[in-house]
């Protein structure tokens, strides 16, 4: 793999801190890139993601799909067009869906099944 196959990326977290920059193969999938981001997540940050489905990568206003490679995403957006330029991608965390549902059920009072209709 030559240098022309590598893309230099850094990842901007929601609080403004960065992961990287590092070089990645343009043939790497977005899903494996997310796994690397999770592995490099700063240890001092709260709410670190555990699964790739909790991470969204945004570049050029587009959310990158897990099954695409970086070279496929390059055709949709501008990634590393100029040599020596570091491309910044934004990292957005999405809490797992089942946690939201569990939290909502715990916070909501139990519903009573009686009618509140009034017929006049």
Swiss-Prot record:
Query: What are the record's GO terms for cellular component?
Result: plasma membrane
Entry's induction text: Not induced by pathogens, cycloheximide and ozone treatment.
User: Which residues carry the post-translational modification Cysteine methyl ester, per the record?
Assistant: 117
What membrane topology is annotated for this entry?
Answer: Lipid-anchor
Q: In which tissues is it expressed?
A: Ubiquitous.
Renumbered to this chain, the positions carrying a covalent lipid of the kind S-geranylgeranyl cysteine are 117
Limits of the Ubiquitin-like domain: 7-72
Ordered alphabetically, the record's keywords are: Cell membrane, Lipoprotein, Membrane, Methylation, Palmitate, Prenylation
**Subcellular location field:** Cell membrane
Q: What domain of life does the UniProt record list for this protein's source? A: Eukaryota
Q: Which residues form the propeptide?
A: 118-120
The keyword Lipoprotein is annotated on this UniProt entry = yes
- Function recorded in the entry: May serve as docking site to facilitate the association of other proteins to the plasma membrane.
An additional note in the Swiss-Prot or TrEMBL entry is: Heat stable and remains soluble at temperatures exceeding 90 degrees Celsius.
Q: What is this protein called?
A: Membrane-anchored ubiquitin-fold protein 5
